[in-house]
Amino acid sequence: MEQTFIMIKPDGVQRGLVGEIIGRFEKKGFSLKGLKLITVDRAFAEKHYADLSAKPFFNGLVEYIVSGPVVSMVWEGKGVLTTGRKIIGATNPLESAPGTIRGDYAIDIGRNVIHGSDAVESARKEIALWFPEGVAEWQSSLHCWIYE
């Protein structure tokens, strides 16, 4: 079954959106496999966003991520990566449709509440980085009501 990495950024944590965001993924039928509340240091944030290191906004992004705790999660389910991106909405909240997390809760691109893996390979890398100890191996009793 496919997995993806989702991170609620410091603004989402500070604004009390953790439960709402988790609820959206659960209500869709995805399974939570890993969850951490963590304050990351600069080196870790730089490693997570290494692919953006040449961008002019890189330092500001790193400062934002280390400014407070984040909630890192691994979600599992059929099509979770693509569907998760749709639930999240466009990177720029002003381009996000109402009903998406960013469309409902964000205005500025620099405070866009949530991060989600954008491809299978980035999901693998991010899960390995944030959850080196692995994730919980379990199956919800609702599985048979969601999947054929």
Curated annotation (Swiss-Prot):
Alphabetical keyword list: ATP-binding, Kinase, Magnesium, Metal-binding, Nucleotide metabolism, Nucleotide-binding, Phosphoprotein, Transferase
Disulfide bonds: none
Enzyme Commission number(s) from the entry: 2.7.4.6
Positions annotated to bind ATP: K9, F57, R85, T91, R102, N112
InterPro entries in UniProt: NDK-like_dom, NDK-like_dom_sf, Nucleoside_diP_kinase, Nucleoside_diP_kinase_AS
Cofactor(s) for this UniProt protein: Mg(2+)
Pfam families: NDK
GO molecular function, one term: metal ion binding
Coiled coil: none
Group of enzyme by EC: transferase
Active site: H115 (pros-phosphohistidine intermediate)
Listed GO biological process terms: CTP biosynthetic process; GTP biosynthetic process; UTP biosynthetic process
Keyword Phosphoprotein: yes
Protein family according to the UniProt entry: Belongs to the NDK family.
Role played: Major role in the synthesis of nucleoside triphosphates other than ATP. The ATP gamma phosphate is transferred to the NDP beta phosphate via a ping-pong mechanism, using a phosphorylated active-site intermediate.
The protein's name: Nucleoside diphosphate kinase
